[in-house]
């Protein structure tokens, strides 16, 4: 296959396609595939061009021809590096001097901490007390200052806004930001460049950054491709939102997909999703564990529960892919080995 790996010295450019201080709706209205292309230019030499893998077994199980875009092999183990790096690469001198702040359950936390380290700036990360130990440890090792909160009783967005005002740091949320969306879309851009047009694109859905960015790429590079988001059954706020035509808020969902434990889709994200996404479906936690086992046994890959969302929809028949060319975004592979073993044992229960 074309593509493979591209690793190089990071280059941070000061660009001004968006002003972080502009009103949100002004920014999202301007978001287009051109922003994904510009993000790809900034990421060149910094992000891995992750491999696209296939599996004869997966094709037999699903009846389709599946192409797995493996962002579990991205820097820090997830697609989140793309959006975080793209956002920080656009900081002006004042923003760089003050540093960056975010809130995240894990992967965006690591992505911001690593991108900030590469840029030579400070980072403060607000993480839930029950975040996976592996993700907390990696965030600290990348140089991020970690502040914890209770995800069930405290509001991370309020904490983030308060700290941003107190410290003067730029807040880059995990998904509701135009530069984050544009960066995430580069994963689908690479996929289409490698395999050509597709019939269906399945994308993991939490807050909507990856889905929105990939939808922008799909509409430009494969106009007839059906774009489908996949979220956990316990957290189907995205599905409800798309059907109602407005953002639906839910309680914090209880699911093993910790990267999708969000209460609502972001505004920037939904602005794109309602225009460019065809459907949103859900999968069960059991299906996620079974898909994790499939990746480990058949494709020799370690994939976290959230990273299995899109693949689970194809492998378990939630989306009919028979006779179709299907792109599948594997969003990440950051799972504690002890947690992985624990989840595998549930299959024998």
Predicted regions, residues:
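PLP-dependent amino-acid enzyme catalytic core
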Residues: 21, 25-349
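Short, Lys/Arg-enriched N-terminal segments with co-localized hydrophobic residues
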Residues: 11-24
């Amino acid at each position: 296959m074309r593509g493979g790996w591209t690793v190089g010295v990071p280059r941070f450019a000061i660009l001004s396609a968006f002003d972080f201080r502009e009103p949100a709706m002004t920014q999202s209205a301007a978001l287009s595939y051109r922003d994904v292309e510009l993000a790809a230019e900034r990421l060149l030499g910094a992000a891995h061009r992750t491999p696209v893998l296939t599996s004869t077994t997966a094709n037999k199980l699903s009846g389709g021809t599946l192409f797995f875009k493996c962002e579990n092999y991205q820097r820090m183990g997830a697609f989140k590096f793309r959006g975080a790096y793209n956002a920080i690469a656009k900081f002006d001198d004042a923003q760089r001097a003050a540093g960056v702040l975010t809130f995240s359950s894990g992967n965006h936390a690591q992505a911001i901490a690593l991108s900030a380290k590469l840029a030579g700036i400070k980072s403060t990360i607000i993480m839930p007390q029950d975040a996976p130990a592996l993700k907390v440890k990696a965030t600290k090792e990348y140089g991020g200052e970690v502040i914890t909160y209770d995800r069930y009783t405290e509001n991370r967005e309020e904490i983030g806004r308060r700290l941003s005002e107190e410290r003067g740091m730029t807040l880059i949320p995990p998904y509701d930001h135009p530069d984050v969306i544009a960066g995430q879309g580069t994963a689908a851009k690479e996929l289409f460049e490698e395999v050509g047009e597709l019939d269906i694109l399945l994308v993991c859905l939490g807050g909507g950054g990856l889905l929105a960015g990939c939808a922008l790429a799909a509409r430009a590079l494969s106009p007839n491709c059906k774009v489908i988001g996949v979220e956990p059954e316990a957290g189907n706020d995205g599905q409800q939102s798309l059907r109602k035509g407005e953002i639906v808020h839910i309680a914090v969902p209880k699911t093993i997909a910790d990267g999708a434990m969000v209460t609502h889709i972001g505004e920037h994200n939904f602005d794109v999703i309602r225009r460019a996404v065809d459907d949103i479906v859900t999968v069960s936690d059991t299906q996620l564990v079974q898909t994790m086992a499939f990746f480990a046994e058949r494709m020799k890959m370690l994939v976290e529960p959230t990273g299995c969302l899109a693949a689970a929809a194809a492998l378990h028949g939630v989306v009919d892919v028979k006779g179709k060319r299907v792109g599948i975004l594997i969003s990440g592979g950051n799972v504690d080995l002890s947690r992985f073993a624990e989840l595998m044992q549930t299959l024998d229960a």
